[in-house]
Amino acid sequence: MFAPIDPVKIPVVSNPWITMGTLIGYLLFVLKLGPKIMEHRKPFHLNGVIRIYNIFQILYNGLILVLGVHFLFVLKAYQISCIVSLPMDHKYKDRERLICTLYLVNKFVDLVETIFFVLRKKDRQISFLHVFHHFAMAFFGYLYYCFHGYGGVAFPQCLLNTAVHVIMYAYYYLSSISKEVQRSLWWKKYITIAQLVQFAIILLHCTITLAQPNCAVNRPLTYGCGSLSAFFAVIFSQFYYHNYIKPGKKSAKQNKN
């Protein structure tokens, strides 16, 4: 089993049995067990719980974002052109560990969203994109932590992700207030656009990093980050096309006829 290389470990998450068991349990519940349990039951009304969850996610991701921006641009702990993890004896190493720990733990908190979908019988939202995205972010985040430790090339990429999540969960919270408020929110599709921009920036960042022969990053992991972002860009583009472009073309064709 994988063992983290940094001597300072994340409680619970650093245990490979608990982590992998959680991820396998997540897949089993959302794809098989959960729908089976809910098959002959009425959907749960979880509006209050979901609002609290959304507020928590806004505050949690906002905290990571503020800490990360301060770390990058105020403390200037990294050389932006070539971001490598801080050495073990660096004065800001504990801060790097804290920010990365908060981020990785949040990827497991994100899994709760799919469980809400199952309990509310929102089967349409339990798509391949949704499940794979949540699973992959937690799984590959854990692998990065095991094989690389804290920080490094993925650090600014994670901050981009938290910024998008603040916007996304703000939308979720506002849309949960009432149907009238939900209908007035015109910027839903721009969340997907923000995600696509995020993946493009990550891919560009990985490419620029790898193009520097003297940049001592972990190259296999940097290739992995770039490849995963490219794959996400493809499946999110497909989602955007089928949900926002294709319906518009169909509507225009019907109006023309």
UniProtKB/Swiss-Prot annotation:
Membrane topology: Multi-pass membrane protein
Family from the record: Belongs to the ELO family.
Sorted UniProt keywords: Behavior, Endoplasmic reticulum, Fatty acid biosynthesis, Fatty acid metabolism, Lipid biosynthesis, Lipid metabolism, Membrane, Transferase, Transmembrane, Transmembrane helix
Pfam families, per the entry: ELO
Expression (tissue specificity): Highly expressed in females. Little or no expression detected in males.
Major location (coarse): endoplasmic reticulum
Top-rank taxon: Eukaryota
EC number: 2.3.1.199
An example Gene Ontology biological process: courtship behavior
The protein, known as: Very long chain fatty acid elongase F
GO terms for cellular component: endoplasmic reticulum membrane
Segments traversing the membrane: 10-30, 55-75, 98-118, 135-155, 158-178, 191-211, 221-241
